[in-house]
């Protein structure tokens, strides 16, 4: 299971960072999910191995443009690339008409079914490998975090149950191991009932804009990776007296330490933070502030950088993408 950051800047792009977009990639390495789609996201995708034909769903955290203005272009390009499979788009209900109008007014034809789902009524979204739920956050507009949880990872046959039910070893077991339904002694046996996860499911939280990390306290229990905004450092907020509904690196780090988060990834950095350490404010100041309060595995997300979440839940940087 991987994370690939397509945009890590808050509000506006910079020369080094595009606006918000994060790819969550299945363990298989092919299918993937997109959280937020700021302007220029499809351009970022051109620098990755990801294909819009393999995109399973898009999840938008809130209505602000740096998280959604890339949608019309990405959807139109998906159609032009030959995509035909239906696509679920989970986003605030307030954006549904905007998406429809953007496509209609630009005479954009989609050769696939676009299913618009209101994030406010989502409950839980599922594919065959992942479950996605939401956590309400605190921002100037309604905002959510998306919690990705693996379903039945690396399933193995429940041999004890098979033996207990007298199901003979052989071809039947092979079919059940594939998740198929078979008939035995007048009974219909469903593969899903005889498969058990061989390891703990990995869990990842990808947050929208949020000024109160404590709202994640329940969801963050036993989470492997927390991806959270760190738009400002504390001195900037203290000097200006406003946070605009965003978090400081210190606030997120303190929460992650208290919650026992193993891997903390900070993203959504204000454009004022430069990559050049000779200039101030510099992105290194975000890292330094977080390190004071957090002793776990800290990562500052970088555009077009891929990170792998191992079977043991450890997060590591991938060389190349």
From Swiss-Prot:
Zn(2+) 1 binds at residues 62, 64, 139, 209. Disulfide bonds: none annotated. It is an enzyme of class 3 (hydrolase). The keyword Nucleus does not apply. The keyword Nuclease applies. InterPro entries: Metallo-B-lactamas, RibonucZ/Hydroxyglut_hydro, RNase_Z/BN. Zn(2+) 2 binds at residues 66-67, 209, 268. Keywords: Endonuclease, Hydrolase, Metal-binding, Nuclease, tRNA processing, Zinc. The active site is at 66 (proton acceptor). It catalyses: Endonucleolytic cleavage of RNA, removing extra 3' nucleotides from tRNA precursor, generating 3' termini of tRNAs. A 3'-hydroxy group is left at the tRNA terminus and a 5'-phosphoryl group is left at the trailer molecule. Its EC number is 3.1.26.11. Its cofactor is Zn(2+). Pfam families: Lactamase_B. One of its GO terms (molecular function) is 3'-tRNA processing endoribonuclease activity. Belongs to the RNase Z family. Homodimer. Zinc phosphodiesterase, which displays some tRNA 3'-processing endonuclease activity. Probably involved in tRNA maturation, by removing a 3'-trailer from precursor tRNA. This is Ribonuclease Z. It comes from Pseudomonas putida (strain W619). The gene is rnz.
């Amino acid at each position: 299971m991987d994370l690939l950051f397509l945009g890590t800047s808050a509000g506006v792009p910079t020369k080094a960072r595009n606006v918000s977009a994060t790819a969550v990639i299945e363990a298989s390495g092919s299918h993937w999910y997109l959280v937020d789609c700021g302007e220029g996201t499809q351009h970022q995708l051109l620098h990755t191995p990801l294909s819009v034909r393999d995109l399973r769903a898009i999840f938008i955290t809130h209505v602000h443009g740096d998280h959604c203005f890339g949608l019309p272009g990405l959807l139109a390009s998906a159609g032009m690339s030959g995509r035909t499979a239906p696509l679920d788009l989970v986003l605030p209900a307030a954006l549904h008409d905007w998406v429809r109008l953007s496509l209609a007014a630009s005479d954009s034809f989609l050769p696939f079914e676009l299913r618009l789902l209101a994030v406010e009524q989502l409950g839980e979204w599922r594919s065959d490998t992942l479950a996605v739920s939401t956590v309400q956050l605190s921002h100037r507009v309604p905002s959510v975090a998306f919690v990705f949880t693996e379903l039945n990872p690396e399933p193995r046959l429940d041999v004890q149950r098979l033996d207990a039910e007298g199901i003979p070893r052989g071809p039947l077991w092979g079919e059940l191991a594939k998740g198929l339904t078979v008939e035995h002694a007048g009974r219909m046996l469903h593969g899903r009932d005889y498969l058990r996860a061989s390891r703990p499911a990995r869990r990842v939280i990808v947050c929208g804009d949020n000024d109160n990390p404590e709202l994640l306290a329940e969801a963050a229990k036993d989470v492997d990776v927390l991806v959270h905004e760190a738009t400002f450092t504390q001195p900037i907020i203290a000097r200006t007296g406003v946070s605009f509904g965003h978090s400081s690196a210190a606030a997120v780090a303190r929460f992650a330490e208290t919650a026992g988060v193993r891997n903390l990834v900070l993203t959504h950095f204000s454009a004022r933070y430069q990559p050049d350490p000779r200039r101030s404010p510099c992105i290194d100041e975000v890292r330094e502030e977080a390190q004071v309060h957090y002793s776990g595995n800290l990562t500052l997300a970088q555009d077009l950088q891929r990170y792998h979440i191992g079977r043991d839940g450890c997060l590591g940087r991938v060389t190349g993408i």
